[in-house]
């Protein structure tokens, strides 16, 4: 593990700096110079008709301004006085019997980057004090994230509009601490991907490899997954977000081992996500058709990475990926025509239907991307990130090519579009399923910093698979 990451993470999560950033964004948007920011953490939620609690996931905007993963917590930030207060639950004697003593206010003050820690029973009193003694007139909160017992009546003005936007826009550019968390998530997830690659040849079922991935992540400190992992063997990889992860790696119909396993998985480290995709040949060596598609996708990714720097238009990176895909598929004979007419007609969308990447942070599809899902151009409809890249933003770069009958068949059935696809050549590639290669990168002023070290050169992957036998 990178020791420089350990040195950064030895300090406190920079909640106070984040609170200042959000307040500054509120001012920039024209909502005033003063007031109090109010946020609630996620509540403990019980499983329906059961006495057990559901898996807990902290609200991301609350964590951004507190660094606190505790459920049932609150915070206030006095903008004018630059004072951040965390409210944590008091001791519940019944809970202590089962769960032990909770964090005390003194312990929380030592642990988190806040100015004061009080109990949640003090929230309303604290808000009233802000109005009466501090002459506070305005409170900023997020709609539908205020508990019924909380009162804003002492305030002259309550704003439910700007805080969510200000927090989400502030989260786009990461600071040194956040990048260290993302780097650690990638380090651990890389170990898990390598473990999966080494086990791929001997595994019998998709779920075996999923179990290896999750166990490796947990053993190194990622107790949670960033999202439901995708372990898609053979033609299952043609489904972009395949979820079942339970099929045998030997095809029951043909009795033959499936060609590849697409693994899209990443561990979550202290609320920050990794999102990595690799493709592994289950036999230990890519088939000729698999290798041809893999090389095109790798070219798509490498040319995309070469374009990334502060100020670049993400739509340009995405469009270039389509052009690389078109050139590659033309060379194989799957497509016919000219690059320009294929690009203008959107034929490559049949094989590359999603965006080339998205923001990454506390959420896998992180905030601030400004997607336009109503875009009538199919090349851009599912692009989760639009506009120019900012220095310090973290993005995924994940081009792919898929052989999904549900997506491709309408193109083949179209008199206008079907003529651009050679079905005889296409027939040889259905069993490839899909290939996607995904890295996580920090945008820098003149380029990028790739956080992902998982092997992606095909010879390296084949060597790892073979060495495990």
Swiss-Prot record:
Cofactor: binding details: Binds 2 manganese ions per subunit.
Listed InterPro entries: Aminopep_P_N, Creatin/AminoP/Spt16_N, Creatinase/aminopeptidase-like, Pept_M24, X-Pro_dipept-like
Cited Pfam families: AMP_N (PF05195), Peptidase_M24 (PF00557)
Key word Thylakoid present: no
UniProt keywords, alphabetically: Aminopeptidase, Hydrolase, Manganese, Metal-binding, Metalloprotease, Protease
Essential cofactor(s): Mn(2+)
EC class (word): hydrolase
Coiled coil: none
GO molecular function: manganese ion binding; metalloaminopeptidase activity
GO biological process, one term: proteolysis
Residues annotated to bind Mn(2+) 1: 275, 398, 438
Positions that bind Mn(2+) 2: 264, 275, 438
Enzyme Commission code(s) on record: 3.4.11.9
Catalytic activity entry: Release of any N-terminal amino acid, including proline, that is linked to proline, even from a dipeptide or tripeptide
Family recorded in the similarity comment: Belongs to the peptidase M24B family.
Function, in words: Catalyzes the removal of a penultimate prolyl residue from the N-termini of peptides.
Full protein name: Probable Xaa-Pro aminopeptidase PEPP
């Amino acid at each position: 593990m990178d020791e420089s990451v350990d040195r950064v993470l030895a300090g406190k999560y920079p909640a106070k700096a984040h609170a200042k950033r959000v307040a500054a964004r509120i001012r920039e948007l024209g909502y005033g110079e003063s007031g109090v920011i109010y946020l609630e953490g996620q509540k403990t939620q019980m499983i329906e008709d059961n006495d057990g609690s559901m898996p807990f996931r902290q609200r991301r905007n609350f964590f951004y301004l507190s660094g606190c993963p505790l459920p049932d917590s609150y915070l206030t930030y006095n903008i004018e006085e630059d004072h951040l207060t965390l409210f944590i639950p008091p001791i519940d004697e019944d809970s202590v019997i089962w769960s032990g003593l909770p964090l005390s206010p003194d312990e929380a003050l030592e642990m988190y980057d806040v100015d004061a820690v009080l109990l949640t029973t003090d929230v309303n009193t604290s808000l009233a004090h802000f109005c009466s003694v501090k002459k506070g007139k305005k409170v900023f909160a997020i709609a539908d994230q205020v508990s019924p017992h909380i009162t804003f009546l002492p305030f002259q003005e309550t704003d439910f509009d700007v805080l969510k936007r200000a927090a989400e826009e502030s989260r786009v550019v990461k600071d040194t601490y956040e990048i260290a968390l993302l780097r650690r998530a990638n380090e651990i997830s890389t170990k898990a991907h390598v473990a999966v690659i080494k086990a791929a040849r001997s595994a019998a079922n998709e779920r075996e490899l999923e179990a290896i991935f999750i166990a490796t992540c947990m053993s190194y400190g990622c107790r949670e997954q960033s999202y439901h992992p995708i372990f898609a063997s053979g033609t299952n990889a043609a489904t972009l977000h395949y979820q079942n992860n339970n099929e045998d790696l030997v095809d029951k119909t043909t009795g033959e081992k499936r060609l590849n396993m697409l693994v899209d998985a990443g561990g979550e480290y202290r609320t920050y996500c990794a999102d990595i995709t690799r493709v592994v040949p289950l036999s230990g060596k890519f088939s000729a058709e698999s290798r041809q598609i893999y090389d095109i996708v790798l070219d798509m990714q490498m040319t995309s990475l070469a374009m990334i720097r502060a100020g670049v238009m993400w739509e340009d990176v995405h469009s270039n990926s389509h052009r690389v895909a078109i050139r590659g598929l033309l060379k194989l004979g799957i497509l016919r025509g000219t690059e320009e007419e294929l690009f203008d007609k959107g034929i490559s969308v049949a094989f590359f239907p999603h965006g080339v990447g998205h923001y990454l942070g506390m959420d896998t599809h992180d905030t601030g991307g400004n997607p336009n899902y109503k875009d009538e151009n199919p090349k851009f409809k599912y692009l989760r990130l639009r506009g120019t890249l900012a220095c310090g933003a973290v993005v995924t770069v994940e081009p792919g090519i898929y052989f999904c009958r549900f997506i491709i068949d309408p193109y083949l059935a179209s008199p206008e579009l079907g003529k651009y696809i050679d079905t005889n050549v296409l027939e040889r590639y259905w069993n490839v399923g899909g290939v996607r290669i995904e890295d996580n990168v920090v945008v820098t002023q003149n380029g990028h910093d790739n956080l992902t070290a998982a092997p992606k050169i095909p010879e390296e992957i084949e060597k790892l698979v073979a060495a495990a036998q």
